[in-house]
């Protein structure tokens, strides 16, 4: 299928390559920025699949339909690559944000406007509510009265609103208008979960000016061929983004998947080295892959592989490292004991 025309693609207008941005709609395919983003009477609208207090992030998540990547392992493919949801204007997003602010019970500083820092206050197990007892892993920060039940489980409500799911930051207008309204009318931090592909210098400046506070950057792979195979797109400028984001004063966290036989310790160490150049205290999560979408023939990592990756990343100089999706690779008591004895306390 032909590439988007320059007149319709914001990236091509800036001399850049378009993303892998086609989505299914009515049995056909269309550009995500045309099928899930629109402008009527000068106002932007975005197709939103759902909005709710998410766990374990413990913030208001806005799940977007339509994406400029075609990730083979995407666990959100059924709405990120398929047109799904209802249209929201920036004013509609503000209305949701204002309503959410009324239930916020954990006020974080701007530097903690991330998913990574959610674990500092609550592990979302619900034990203090269901069993009236805190587990040994509890941070012991919050009283039980602060723990709320949401569609995804127990936890607090932090003062953050996040755009997640499909990524169309290559067309920043909607995010810009939403951020301006949210910052003007609430005390919430604005976080964008992103693959980074659309975040060239101009778009970063526009988002900074609008009041966006933080980014959760998924770096899929270091090797350009692996990244292209995984996503359909280049990672050339994505690897430069951590430094560009830090330079502009954004709060930042980075996440990468450990995918056996594809993105393993060597790849993750190279990503960590690049992050360390931007700042050793950037929070970094090693997330265990599980088979999904077009990668169901791939296996999950072992606990030994994850531990090896953890120490490799640590050797690169990063100070804030966490392991995610523990249940994927540490399913037995033996695996859990091995993990606890081989990584630092609080790292998962």
Each language-model region and where it sits:
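N-terminal [4Fe-4S]-dependent radical SAM core
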Residues: 1-147, 154, 334-337, 343-348
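Conserved AdoMet/S-adenosylmethionine-binding subsite of the radical SAM
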Residues: 139-300
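Conserved active-site and cofactor/substrate-binding residues in soluble primary-metabolism enzymes
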Residues: 66-69, 88, 173, 266, ...
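Hydrophobic, Leu/Ile/Phe/Ala-enriched alpha-helical segments that form helix-helix packing faces
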Residues: 97-101, 182, 275, 313
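Residue-level detector of family-conserved "landmark" positions at structurally sensitive sites
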Residues: 81-84, 193, 254-255, 323-324
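Auxiliary Fe-S-binding modules of radical SAM enzymes
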Residues: 1-19, 246, 258-348
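Short, highly selective alpha-helical patches that border small-molecule cofactor pockets
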Residues: 24-26, 175, 306
